[in-house]
Amino acid sequence: MRKIAAAALCLMLCVGLAACAGRVLSSKEENTMRAETQHETVELKVVTSYGADDGNRKNYENAVEAYEASTGNRVLDDSSRASEEWRYKVFTDFETGSDPDVLFFFTNADAEPFIRAGKLVSIEEVRTMYPDYATNMKPAMIARAADGKHYAVPSTGYWENLFVNRQVLERSGVAVPGPDYTWEQFLEDCEKIKQAGFIPIACSLSEIPHYLFEFLIMNNGSLENQLELPRLENGQLVMDETAEKWIAALKDMKQLYDAGYFPANTMTATDSETVIQFAEGMAAFLVDGSWKCGYFAESYPQNLENYVVCCVPGKGERPATDTIGGISMGYFITRKAWNDPQKRAAAVEFVSQLTSDETLSTFVKTEITALKSGAVPKD
């Protein structure tokens, strides 16, 4: 009789578990799952671009600490500054089976190889079990992949523009640029700055030349064709309007290099080194992004009055007030984590906490946000 009762109990448990596996979890069940993960430590491998010199590194560290404290889980942080080397490492890790559990990465075409390989889980799939996942985001601002699905929960946005060291300009006899700044004025100012013994443009051509180059492309084209890329046919460059725009931009870059407006070691210096040249008053101009605001505030609080954000000089159809910005990065949950029930819950909770209204508000200073309620910075 006891054997029959035990068998019946096992059958009831199996039926109950099978029923749970195929339906959406209620809020109560989600809370139960979160409570369970708090009692058994889960290690999450997380890859981000919040490296040591990133302006939001401290905010990221605080968010991770809060997550670990609230869940009892442990984050194995594998963060580095965004660069081609970092991007290459991310691709290599996926190719060699060293997938992270959560990835903070570009939401554009760079993520498509991972999506096509089935390495990432869509937000739609996550919501089959966690219906409230990423519902604090504006749907229109969640990047859509080529397959029509959405994978990345947006983080903070960004803008790119011209940082100016006011002190260097004053010592060079150059005025702070206005909203109608032209390419011709910029070249004249660079020459004055060079003659005064300063570096006109802080830029590492060997590591991160693209912030400046993006504007040079726009200066030789238009907003409408900014994202168009040159094409090859049979190994030969197709000489069309796009190719001509890129060639003209490269010529402008070469003009700046030949004139000696970059650091003497621009072909070997790291981006960090050239940013320091700007921050410490050795260089006048730096084309960079909003993420640098936090870096300057934390690393050079005594010099903040010297830094001004101005417009990148305009040329052709582009007025100086046309800039570059948007939301280009977000959090992905990998298939590796999703297929592990414990890591699944831990990863969902991690992304949910890192992209909550409260947490993202600590990251946002002047950037675009996808939060429905908007960001409310504390400072």
What name fits each language-model region?
Residues 6, 20-112, 116-117, 128-130, ...:
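Conserved N-terminal structural module of periplasmic/extracytoplasmic solute-binding proteins
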Residues 188-192, 234-267:
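Glycine-centered hinge/linker elements that transmit conformational signals in sensory
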Residues 146-155, 160, 185-237, 254, ...:
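Extracytoplasmic/periplasmic solute-binding protein
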Residues 36, 124-136, 178-179, 221-248, ...:
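Short, solvent-exposed loop/beta-turn-alpha elements that line the ligand-binding surface or hinge
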Residues 42-48, 65-70, 74, 172, ...:
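Extracytoplasmic/periplasmic substrate-recognition and gating elements
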Residues 80-89, 109, 181-187, 265-279:
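Short helix-initiation/N-cap motifs at beta->coil->alpha
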Residues 69-80, 173-178, 254-268, 282, ...:
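A local structural motif
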Residues 30-40, 106-164, 187, 212-218, ...:
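Hinge/lid segment of periplasmic solute-binding proteins
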